[in-house]
Every structure is written in C-alpha cells, then in structure tokens.
Amino acid sequence: MELEGRGAGGVAGGPAAGPGRSPGESALLDGWLQRGVGRGAGGGEAGACRPPVRQDPDSGPDYEALPAGATVTTHMVAGAVAGILEHCVMYPIDCVKTRMQSLQPDPAARYRNVLEALWRIIRTEGLWRPMRGLNVTATGAGPAHALYFACYEKLKKTLSDVIHPGGNSHIANGAAGCVATLLHDAAMNPAEVVKQRMQMYNSPYHRVTDCVRAVWQNEGAGAFYRSYTTQLTMNVPFQAIHFMTYEFLQEHFNPQRRYNPSSHVLSGACAGAVAAAATTPLDVCKTLLNTQESLALNSHITGHITGMASAFRTVYQVGGVTAYFRGVQARVIYQIPSTAIAWSVYEFFKYLITKRQEEWRAGK
C-alpha cells in the first residue's frame, strides 16, 4: 500500500485499520488525504516532510495529488468501492481462515493448508460454498468503509485547524483515525458475526436472514457486538506493527522516498503480512467470540464466552499456546493480496479523478 514517508506522521499519524478493512487502506488514505486534501485546504504537507515535486507543464496532471475540489463524497465512494472489492475478491480465503481458526473442528473439516482446504470445501460442499455470507460482507463493507473515509477526512481537517492552523497535525491524524475506526468497526461488526457463522463447517444457516434471526432470538442483540472490544484491541497493535514494518522496508526499497508503485506495493504487502501474523492470537479470539463455539466446548466451559479475557482463557484451555496461531497461514495469505487490491483501487480512483479534473479545467 502507498505509505509514503511522512516523517513521524507515517507511523503515529496513520489511521487504524479494522477487520473488514485492510491496514493498507488506512495507510493509503493517510497519504492520499495528506497529499490531496491537505494541499487543497492549505496544509503544507509537502514543504514540511519532503521537497515539492517539480512537474513539467506538458507532462499532464500530477498523479500524486487529488484535485483541490475533491469532496467528502469522493472519499466515501472510493473507500466503499475499494472495501467491497477487497472483501469480495479474497472472500474464499477468508472462509478458509475462519474454519482453520476453529478450536475443535469436525474431523471432516481439518485442513493441512489453505489450498487443500479450499479444494476440499469446493469438492465436498459445492463450488459456491466458500462464498456463503459474501452478500452480508459486501453490504457491511460498503457503508463501513465509506463512513471511515468521511469521518477520518472531516475530523482530521477539523482537528488540524485547531491544533496546527494552516498545517498538518500528526496528533489530529491519530485522533481522527481512532474515531474513524470506532465508527467503522461499529458498522462492520454485526456483518462479521453473521459472516463467520455462515462460513463455519456444517453451518445451519443458508441465508443471512436466518442467521440474523437465530442470533437475535437465542443470544440477543448484544451478540452482534460481543467481539467489538477485541476487534478494536486487535487494530492498535496491528496498525503499529504495520507502519513500523513498512517504514523499515521503505528505507531499503525506496530510500529517496519518491513515488514508486512497486516499492509501495511490496513494502505494504510485506508489512501487512507481518502485522497479520503477529496479531493472529487476537483474531482467533475474535473468531471464537463471533462463532460462539461453546456448544462444542461444553467439557471446558459453560454458558457463553462474554469477552476478550474469557476468550483468551478458553483458547488456551482447549488448544494450548499453539491454538492462538490457528489459521495464521490463511490470514497472511489473505492480507498480502488484500493490500495490493486496496492500493490499486485507490490509485485508480486517484488517477481518474485527477485526469477528469484536468480535462475539465482544460476545456473551460
């Protein structure tokens, strides 16, 4: 993902990422808004962090900068489309990840690796089985990502005007990212619960409405947010590791910190993979909270798992330390292309918006 060097802002100022939202999206958003909206609003990002790029008037529009007239709607649409595409393309791998994180899987659902799991699911359960629950994921990802972008962009500018008038504030970036993540995860968490229950082996749910109705009637509305705090807790270390790894790799692959798509994709993908592997224990706990495997764990616990602490204890009681890293392979494999997909979509929108704006200006 495009996490160009921003001094301290590249790490501390980046927005946090959610489960249904890759860290690459958040990183690219930070770089995108700082380059585009920050300049349009009077922020001096380029002068503060790196020398301005001199552009030949005949070379066409500046590919790195959004037009000054970019609106909140632009960020909402770009975020929604990128989020939906990312989740849809990688959904089969996400299904495999969820199953591999099961603490006590059915003998027919024990997989050695991602490819074997995907092949067996298709062969024994049907071609479209890995896609079950995709509709609720896409429905949740669109509004969640749009809300994230709109909140981050608006709050970042508002706080920057208060903290550092006329410039860019890393504190404002961090605060805006935290608030945006709270809203994003609040919108996405119910969809995550339904999606993961439909992904499990022998899931009794074939339709989203059946799953929603059963969860509501049997466990109450709170079940849709049982993993919310765990999700938020996972995002903080995930984002920190992601940015630190990215900056380290950029120092080697792109020491001049110029616009270099290949270095951004490679660094972002590697950083996402490292962060995904490191935070897998929290993801396992989140999956347990969402799927509520207590029915299969009656020999160890009674009742529902109510929070992150009880989820951590249950995972250890059932599978030991190694259980915290169930599905790590699938999680890493999912994260690498997800980062590239999100980055590519944002770059496409950025280029398209800039090109059309320049064409409109030229035609005036």
From Swiss-Prot:
Single GO MF descriptor: ferrous iron transmembrane transporter activity
Swiss-Prot/TrEMBL GO biological process terms: iron import into the mitochondrion
Tissues where the protein occurs: Ubiquitous. Expressed in placenta, lung, kidney, pancreas, liver, brain, skeletal muscle and heart.
Assigned keywords, A-Z: Ion transport, Iron, Iron transport, Membrane, Mitochondrion, Mitochondrion inner membrane, Repeat, Transmembrane, Transmembrane helix, Transport
Gly residues bias spans: 1-17
InterPro entries registered for this protein in UniProt: Mitochondrial_sb/sol_carrier, Mt_carrier_dom_sf
Region Disordered, annotated ranges: 1-28, 40-60
A cellular component annotation (GO) from this entry: mitochondrial inner membrane
Solcar repeat residue numbers: 70-158, 168-252, 259-352
Transmembrane segments: 72-91, 133-152, 170-189, 227-246, 261-280, 327-346
Reactions catalysed, as given in the entry: Fe(2+)(in) = Fe(2+)(out)
Amino acid composition bias (Low complexity), ranges on this chain: 18-27
Pfam families from the UniProt entry: Mito_carr
Job description of the protein: Mitochondrial iron transporter that mediates iron uptake. Probably required for heme synthesis of hemoproteins and Fe-S cluster assembly in non-erythroid cells.
Stated family: Belongs to the mitochondrial carrier (TC 2.A.29) family.
Name used for this protein in its record: Mitoferrin-2
